[in-house]
Amino acid sequence: MRAPATHIGDVFEIPISDSFKRYMQFVVVDSCQLGGWGIRVFKKDYPLDCNSAIDDILNGEVDFFCLTRAIGHGVLDGLWTKVGKSKDLGDLDKMVFRTYVERVPGILASHWFVWKANHNLKEYKTLPRRYRKVDYGGVMPPSHVVERIRTGRWFKVQNVYDDYDSYLTKWGCERISVPFLRQQRKD
């Protein structure tokens, strides 16, 4: 089956649980990062049975911006469905991304790239404070976008503490708490 055509301005709904959904809008094709398709994801959760007006959705607060490559494949995979279209794309100057390039000895120094959608990259050796909370600029698959909406993280990360508790239970052990030990100085 072929992925449906998507266009700038398309609005999609994303079920995030058995009772809630969120919305996102395709707003730009970013020429700076592999031609990634820029989307803005809105923060408000809506009940699944709610049919909100597109204008009300687009006036809501933006949770995050991201780049993806296959919006149509997200529809095919059942991750989101198209619900409408709007010419209101919001303020694209707020769509700022960052990415880090690791050092390759003798070839490349470590540095940060920061850019606004469809603007030139700026390169920094140290990431300036004003860019520390901007969104990651990698091109993500649709499943990672949904994971970010549901959990606030790009990838599924196991909870180390839950794994530790299950390990202790398996072996019949109890969790112990070790207080912070302060070394006392002898004069």
Regions found by a protein language model. Name each.
Residues 1-47, 52-53:
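Short N-terminal edge-element motif at the start of the domain
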Residues 47-187:
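Intrinsically disordered, low-complexity, charged/polar segments
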